[in-house]
Amino acid sequence: RKESSAASDVYKRQINDSEPAPKFNIVERPNTWAKAMKKTAALSETENLKLAFWEKFNNEAPKHSAFIREFKLRKPQAQHWYDLGLGSSAYHLCMTLNTKNNCLSAGLYVNEDKDIITRFKSNEELVSKILGIINPNEIEWRLDENKKASRFLILHPMGDMNDKDNWDNGCAWLCDMCVKIK
């Protein structure tokens, strides 16, 4: 016996004397455009801004050859962070978008091994020099003994994050800083 819906057919199937069981036959699969539109419609204004910024980043990053040689882009998400692998599960690069403070950041996120960040911190002046930071206080160090993860990050003021004219500059800064950190 067959019953039909828009996305699948359902058959009643019985083998020998067993109890009848439903058998689903998928006849229509959701299309990715419709899924993307549905997902976007459910996002808040801030989430849409974050998604649009990371999409812009993915479009701008290939223009920066040093960045593209070092990193693999990932699918943009409606979240405040965008992670880049560095070939180790112990740490990764993390870029963030802070819509409240209107700034970007790039830094190293270490999952558990606090010694990694401690070694960087003990060479703070050298780290600042390599990253092209004049004032070492521009590096924010987050070493909390009560948390597993630790990190350092560099902040970049953006003005109004809603002003998309600022985004090219922000994307270029992120690409440059990530290459320097690596």
Segments (PLM) and residue ranges:
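Single conserved hydrophobic/aromatic residue that forms the stacking wall/gate
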Residues: 1-7, 11
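Polyanion-binding interface signature
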Residues: 39-158
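Generic recognition of cysteine residues
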Residues: 11, 94, 103, 171, ...
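Ampiphathic alpha-helical segments that act as solvent-exposed interaction surfaces
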Residues: 122-134, 158-182
